């Protein structure tokens, strides 16, 4: 319920302070809610109803606060409370939302988009796909590589042949040295390693006669026990 007082719009709370602007039914209803008895004669007359309303039901002004520290603090709280009420009345729907609604029309294109660059860079991702010419080059390279297989195979066989020749030469030299150094008799040598295997070092076995001679040539003094000298 709202009205106009002096050419300006008034809220319901302000109208309660002006009972002459209220209707007769509203005055009766407020008096009944306040449990104020109204006689039948007064129900017909609006002036008597207004007098009763001013006497018992009109909202009284708030008491003046003292000019102390507590009074100033309470005045600030009242002002803040009134401001909050006004904001809730003006925008009840906006108060429920924590963030304002963002509406994109689609017509504005002035927005700028920032892209973060990674360490490796995204340029490789954005490159175009290779064309058909690149595929033809790969086929040519594969055909060239197939033609160059045979010389590579031959060259891979060369080092094995060289190793075999070197191994045979080493075996022959070792065999000649063993025959020259052992005048007493033939020396048993291990069987030759197969062709292509790793070369094995040959150790010359000492004959039995040389071993016995070395034992006999040892000085006899080494076998004597040490005699302890005793004083007389």
UniProtKB/Swiss-Prot annotation:
GO cellular component, one term: nucleus
Keyword list, A-Z: Nucleus, Phosphoprotein
Low complexity bias locations: 144-156
Subcellular location: Nucleus
InterPro entries given in the database record: Ashwin (IPR024887)
Biased composition, class Polar residues, residue ranges: 130-140
Modified-residue entries (Phosphoserine), positions: 143, 182, 189, 193
Entry-annotated residues carrying Phosphothreonine: 198
Keyword Signal: no
Stretches with biased composition (Basic and acidic residues): 64-97, 116-127, 163-179
Span list, region Disordered: 64-232
UniProt record, GO biological process: embryonic morphogenesis
Family: Belongs to the ashwin family.
PANTHER family: ASHWIN
Quaternary data: Component of the tRNA-splicing ligase complex.
Name assigned to this protein: Ashwin
């Amino acid at each position: 319920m709202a009205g106009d007082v002096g050419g300006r719009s008034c809220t319901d709370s302000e109208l309660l302070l002006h009972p002459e602007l209220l209707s007769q039914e509203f005055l009766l209803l407020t008096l009944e809610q306040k449990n104020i008895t109204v006689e039948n004669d007064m129900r017909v007359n609006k002036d008597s109803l207004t007098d009763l309303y001013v006497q018992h039901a009109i909202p009284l002004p708030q008491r003046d606060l003292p000019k102390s520290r507590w009074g100033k603090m309470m005045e600030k709280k009242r002002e803040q409370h009134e401001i909050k009420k006004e904001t809730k009345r003006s925008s009840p729907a906006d108060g429920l939302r924590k963030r304002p609604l963002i509406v994109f029309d689609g017509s504005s294109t002035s927005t700028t988009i920032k892209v973060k660059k990674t360490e490796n860079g995204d340029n490789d991702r954005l490159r175009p796909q290779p064309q058909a010419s690149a595929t033809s080059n790969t086929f040519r390279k594969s055909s060239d590589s197939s033609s160059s297989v045979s010389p590579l195979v031959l060259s891979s066989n060369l080092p094995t042949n060289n190793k075999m020749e070197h191994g045979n030469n080493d075996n022959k030299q070792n065999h000649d040295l063993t025959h020259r150094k052992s005048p007493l008799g033939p020396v048993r040598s291990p069987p030759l390693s197969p062709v292509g295997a790793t070369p094995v070092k040959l150790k010359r076995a000492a004959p039995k006669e040389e071993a016995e001679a070395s034992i006999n040539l040892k000085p006899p003094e080494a076998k004597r026990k040490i005699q302890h000298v005793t004083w007389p």
